[in-house]
Amino acid sequence: MAPTAPPILDFSPFYGTDGAAKAKLVQQVRESCEYNGFFQITGHRIPRELQVRVMDAAKRFFALPLEEKMAIDKNLNSFNRGYELLRSQMLEVGTAPELKEGLYIGEEIGADHPYYINGRLNSGPNQWPATVPDAQEFRETSMEYYHAVYELAKDVLAVLALTLDVEESFFDPLTEGGVATMRMLHYPSQPKDEDEKLNRGIGAHTDFGCITLLLQDEVDGLQVLDAPSGQWLDVQPVLGAYVVNLGDLMMRMANDRYKSNIHRVINKSGRERYSIPFFFSGNPDHVCKCLPNCCKAGEQPKYPPITVEDMVRGAYKQSYGRAEAYKKELAEKAKAHKIEAASATAMVS
């Protein structure tokens, strides 16, 4: 069978009363999870008008001067909120740090919240840009959208529970008090002749947490690896749809029955690209262990239990550590080159 891009599924039967249509949706999601963990959904409950507003908000933020964006640099705090500069992250070994900038937003966690006090995963107050046009509307739209997608993530997890032949409510302990990160992302256009082996909008990687729900604009660039054929498949934007993919934590809980698949972004369109992924991790203290019907009788799970906090925090450290190591290596090479050049000049004179 020729490889095909992730299927586009009508999610509306989840909300309806047609049992056969709902069973068909569950089977389609199950097949997608077993193949490569990617699918797109339409027929959800997030209004198109809200999607348009939040995408417009993202564009207003990224149009700000760099110094104004850097005023909320996420490196100024320990809870992963705020602005991320271009080339800050490196997910694919052997490439340059990534050609994207972002704004990280999550649930508002005040200084008196136990998550903030105890330094839990990605938990703290949002770092809002002071100079973005219509600043109050920017904040309100961002949080309205965050909460809407959080509810959709819960619905997707309910369908995932049904694919495992357990109750829709199975993942409720994971979603109660769950941590999620919404990123507004901007990919500058890459020159068409730029070395795509080195330059990525986002390098080839798998996501860290449970599930991701991605809102794309009309500019393509997202590619999913079809493992059996080794081909990269374009995930064409579908107006109003969400690209859903499973993360490493879900694959681990599913004992590798379900897949967290490799994907990347290469923006060779000649245009700027914007997207808003929503990364759902879960309650930081939730202990993730082998899910029902994912381990054959008499077999041991492949992985020991792990908390959401430990799994996701470890993955973050790795990807950002690679970028810093790469920059350090470049600086050392530049320094060595200067020393060599100075020595050569001295010998000539």
From Swiss-Prot:
Domain of life the protein comes from: Eukaryota
Positions of the Fe2OG dioxygenase domain: 178-282
Signal sequence, start to end: none
Protein's UniProt keywords contain Iron: yes
Residues that bind Fe cation: H205, D207, H263
Cofactor note: Binds 1 Fe(2+) ion per subunit.
Induction: Expression is induced by nicotinate and 6-OH nicotinate, subject to nitrogen metabolite repression mediated by the GATA factor areA, and strictly regulated by the cluster-specific transcription regulator hnxR.
UniProt-listed Pfam families: 2OG-FeII_Oxy, DIOX_N
InterPro entries recorded: DIOX_N, IPNS-like_FE2OG_OXY, IPNS-like_sf, Iron_ascorbate_oxido_reductase, Oxoglu/Fe-dep_dioxygenase_dom
UniProt keyword annotations, A-Z: Dioxygenase, Iron, Metal-binding, Oxidoreductase
Family per record: Belongs to the iron/ascorbate-dependent oxidoreductase family.
Protein name: 2-oxoglutarate-Fe(II) type oxidoreductase hxnY
Organism field: Emericella nidulans (strain FGSC A4 / ATCC 38163 / CBS 112.46 / NRRL 194 / M139)
